[in-house]
Amino acid sequence: MPEKTQPIHQLAALLQEGKAEPIIVPARLAPSAIYDVEYRTAVVALVFERFAKPVGPTELRKISSARLKLLQFLTLRPWLLPAVRRWSDAGKQSGFAFGHSVRIRRGFLSDSAHDDVISYLVACGRLKRFETQIVSGTSGGALMEIAKSIAEHELFASERGAIEQLADIRITNEMLEGW
């Protein structure tokens, strides 16, 4: 009797027995939205609009670059929110917090698309880098308009929902260390 815990292996064996050959039609493959510059820009705009803080009496706003990267990473992956909440609630209980952070950091550290989008937005004048901070640039109002338009047209409901959940999770500096 075949083992029921290995359905993928069973399917692979059946396909091999029947001499099945995969056919890939590139025109029918959909690229992942996670690598789309416009999508990532929209997510950065939503996160920046919600979490960036005012800089003195100016209209400029800023956010820690590590915080922005973590928040947009989690916005794109809302299934990680329960783990982040547990990580945050664990506080300085290092063993418990470390276990949660390792699972999240594994994917987070290899996510270079965010860095590329931020570099693009800096080159366009939408954002500026200032030491460890990301600051709204001379054309930073464009990001605010993107976020406003997304909300007005009720787009990206999942992402906006994740951002609202993130607003209730305390992201500490300890959580951001080493990022």
Language-model segments: which ranges?
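Leucine-rich, amphipathic alpha-helical/linker segments
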Residues: 157-179
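Short, hydrophobic/amphipathic alpha-helical patches that form generic packing surfaces
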Residues: 39-53, 70-76, 120-123
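Basic amphipathic alpha-helical segments that dock to polyanions
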Residues: 113-125
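Accessory beta->alpha helical hairpin/"wing" motif in late/C-terminal subdomains of nucleic-acid enzymes
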Residues: 128-164
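A glycine-rich, hydrophobic loop/mini-helix early in the fold
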Residues: 62-101
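Eukaryotic partner-binding/assembly regions in large regulatory complexes
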Residues: 1-52
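Short, surface-exposed loop/turn segments at secondary-structure junctions
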Residues: 56-61
